């Protein structure tokens, strides 16, 4: 129903948690190289538990290859520099949610490929830098899925 893109993720447990999230929500996960870890990393596998076999995951050599694979899809960049609040967007089946690396977020040249209404920011208290990557992915994905009455869930 939805896709999540992790652009150059750095921290194995975050990606492992998102693998588990995707497996439990029927979401396809896209990883854009370079990755900050091996897909055989113990922490990645531990965080994802035994959900790796249930996750639909694709690894892309670079951002351009990922965009080509998702051509024609509506894409949203999750960024602290966004202005659109996640709860005000009417998400559609097939939407794609793009997240940047944990320590620096999406680079400006990637963010600039998204219109302002497709740059999404999750609300948080002032003077805080950002939310955890896997938590942000869960918040956004569950809001989008909720809008579709949790289609396919038990």
From Swiss-Prot:
Q: Does the keyword Transferase apply?
A: yes
What's a single GO CC term here? cytoplasm
UniProt-listed CDD domains: SpoU-like_TrmL
Main location as per UniProt: cytoplasm
Its EC number is: 2.1.1.207
Q: Tell me, what's a Pfam family for it? A: SpoU_methylase
Localization per record: Cytoplasm
Cysteine disulfide links? none
Q: Which GO terms describe its biological process?
A: wobble position ribose methylation
MF terms per GO, please?
A: RNA binding; tRNA (5-carboxymethylaminomethyluridine(34)-2'-O)-methyltransferase activity; tRNA (cytidine(34)-2'-O)-methyltransferase activity
Q: Which Gene3D superfamilies match?
A: 3.40.1280.10
Query: What UniProt keywords apply to this chain's record, in alphabetical order?
Result: Cytoplasm, Methyltransferase, S-adenosyl-L-methionine, Transferase, tRNA processing
Cross-referenced NCBIfam families: tRNA_yibK_trmL (TIGR00185)
Report the function annotation for this chain.
Methylates the ribose at the nucleotide 34 wobble position in the two leucyl isoacceptors tRNA(Leu)(CmAA) and tRNA(Leu)(cmnm5UmAA). Catalyzes the methyl transfer from S-adenosyl-L-methionine to the 2'-OH of the wobble nucleotide.
Against PANTHER family, the record matches this protein to: TRNA (CYTIDINE(34)-2'-O)-METHYLTRANSFERASE (PTHR42971:SF1)
| Protein name according to UniProt | tRNA (cytidine(34)-2'-O)-methyltransferase
| Organism (species) | Methylovorus glucosotrophus (strain SIP3-4)
């Amino acid at each position: 129903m939805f896709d999540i893109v992790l652009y150059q993720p750095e921290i194995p447990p975050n990606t492992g948690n998102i693998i588990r999230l995707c497996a439990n929500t029927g979401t396809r996960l896209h990883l854009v190289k370079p990755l900050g870890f091996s897909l055989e990393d113990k922490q990645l596998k531990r965080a994802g538990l035994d959900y790796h076999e249930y996750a639909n995951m694709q690894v892309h050599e670079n951002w351009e290859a990922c965009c080509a694979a998702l051509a024609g899809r509506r894409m949203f960049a999750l960024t602290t520099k966004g202005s659109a609040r996640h709860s005000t967007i009417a998400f559609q089946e097939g939407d794609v949610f793009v997240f940047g690396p944990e320590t620096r977020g999406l680079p400006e040249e990637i963010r600039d490929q998204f219109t302002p209404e497709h740059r999404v920011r999750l609300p948080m208290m002032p003077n805080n830098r950002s939310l955890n990557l896997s938590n942000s992915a869960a918040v956004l994905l569950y809001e989008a899925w909720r809008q579709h009455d949790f289609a396919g869930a038990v």
